[in-house]
Amino acid sequence: MSEKMVAIMKTKPEYGAELVEVDVPKPGPGEVLIKILATSICGTDLHIYEWNEWAQTRIRPPQIMGHEVAGEVVEVGPGVEGIEVGDYVSVETHIVCGKCYACKRGQYHVCQNTKIFGVDTDGVFAEYAVVPAQNVWKNPKNIPPEYATLQEPLGNAVDTVLAGPIAGKSVLITGAGPLGLLGIAVAKASGAYPVIVSEPSEFRRNLAKKVGADYVINPFEEDVVKEVMDITDGNGVDVFLEFSGAPKALEQGLQAVTPAGRVSLLGLFPGKVSIDFNNLIIFKALTVYGITGRHLWETWYTVSRLLQSGKLNIDPIITHKYKGFDKYEEAFELMRAGKTGKVVFMLK
């Protein structure tokens, strides 16, 4: 193994990133070194690349970017048990303390001292990466790397869709970005019908159809609530899944969901949102879930089994694959333009 590696690094507190050569890291106690086989771009990575307000308060350059990954263990640090060289793995990004009130109740996904791998630490946009052993997930060999790298965001989608019963339920999904597209795939694989998708981008509406959406709506040109009511015989949808983070989409979804229906919110909104709680939530007796992270490790088991079942139609979601990191700037600019689903760097 070479002592040097290539990595996409946020070198300066400004727009963009650089492709650099750095030393291959060494695993310390409780850590493993993995060789990257595939890694995918997340919206968080795009925020770091763009150097938005959130990134400016959270990221401390120089830092290797990336956190969605599939790889092979090539070295194990002192004190690590249950993980061996040659294991095919992915990584849970939430590094939890195990000591706080939430962790002691088994609610690791809301650990009060969470650090994010690839945000608060160096990440996986590199040929090798050091990972906390406690965050390693062993993959079955029959899941290809370009799928295995998607398990972290797929876990977000699974928790959003499966927060309540979904089989045989009518569903409205607002936002068909990468996470919304994964949500469509999970809903269809889990027996939802019809799955209605509201998305302003024609490119993403077409992707939604390919993934399995039964109806697509352009919210800029059509009345979302009217369309949903027409499709559902005036009843509204049983389940509303919000992936966009758009306040208007939230309001439309709450209007379109049936009384005593279920709502799952994953999209992040730009600040405070004004909602008529009395008429849209309380008097409708809605059950509303806020979704963050993934349940450790229940969600990972669900994701892995869904992938192994062959029922998840995620091929259309992976719109761009790059061999290595050389065209990383093109990849990020395409994502900025909204012209991608998931973008995967293949290093195998």
Curated annotation (Swiss-Prot):
Active site located where?
Answer: T44, H47
Q: Which cofactor does it need?
A: Zn(2+)
Q: Which residues bind Zn(2+) 2?
A: C97, C100, C103, C111
What enzyme class is recorded for this protein? oxidoreductase
Please give the start and end residues of each transmembrane region.
none
InterPro entries linked to this entry? ADH-like_C, ADH-like_N, ADH_Zn_CS, GroES-like_sf, L-Threonine_3-DHase, NAD(P)-bd_dom_sf, PKS_ER, Zn_alcohol_dh
The free-text note explaining how the cofactor binds reads:
Binds 2 Zn(2+) ions per subunit.
The record's Gene Ontology cellular component field reads: cytoplasm
Q: Which reaction does it catalyse?
A: L-threonine + NAD(+) = (2S)-2-amino-3-oxobutanoate + NADH + H(+)
Cellular location(s): Cytoplasm
Q: What's an example GO BP annotation here?
A: protein homotetramerization
State a single Pfam family of this protein: ADH_zinc_N
Subunit: Homotetramer.
**What HAMAP family would the database entry show?**
Thr_dehydrog
Protein name in UniProt = L-threonine 3-dehydrogenase
Q: Which organism is it from?
A: Pyrococcus furiosus (strain ATCC 43587 / DSM 3638 / JCM 8422 / Vc1)
- What is the gene name? tdh
